[in-house]
Amino acid sequence: TDFVAKNADFVKLAQDILDAAVANKCKSIDEVKALPMGGHTVAEAVTDRSGITGEKMELDGYNFIEGDNVAVYDHMGRHMLCTMVQTNKPAEEEAHNVAMQVAAMNPVALDEASVPQAVKDEELKVAIEKTKEEQVKKAVEAALKKAGFNLYIAESEEHLEEGIMKGNITAEQADQIRELKKTTAEQKAANLPEQMIQNIANGRMNKFYKESCLLNQEYIQDSKMTVSEYLKSADKELTVTAFKRFTLRAE
């Protein structure tokens, strides 16, 4: 709560933990939790403070960027959403603007090469399945239209039952629709052109990279350029080398 967050002892504990993490050059949250503090570990110190305040507390986030040229952005100055951006050379204004970009657009990686392979594999899998579903749906709709059936009525079992109740179709016609949808979907799914599916899925992946990779994203202050292009408009050699984003809000 705000009451606890503004408490002097709580603020001091948070600052002490941060100072210890920086001094010991911790690389992970587990390393931070294991640090000694007041005869205990950091994790135990947090638990003790939780018992004193009566509110559940957990140290569940730790981010750092090592090196120079790091800009920090605290959204609205409330410590609820903070970002860090590191550039390859001094560029205070540009780094600050990109830090705001990170806050607003929540990129998952710096560029395509930085996206974890597991994420790429999952996104491609989803893209392929979605493409297949769309192709099957188009084939089913085309078959229904050709047979003269209303697409709204044929859309779902609920609509079919509604159509029968209102007298728009007969029970026999509803069965015909069900059978046509089933056979058409099976036939289309068994004969989908693999190369076409892959090409469409690749297009979806390119869209994913554009939306999810920081340097590929449209720059929020000028949608006519990407973040990478914005940086290069200031300095042809300027780029982002690392970024971090941390929020206390569920997203």
Task: Show where each model-derived region lies.
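N-terminal assembly/interaction segments in proteins that build large macromolecular machines
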Residues: T1-E251
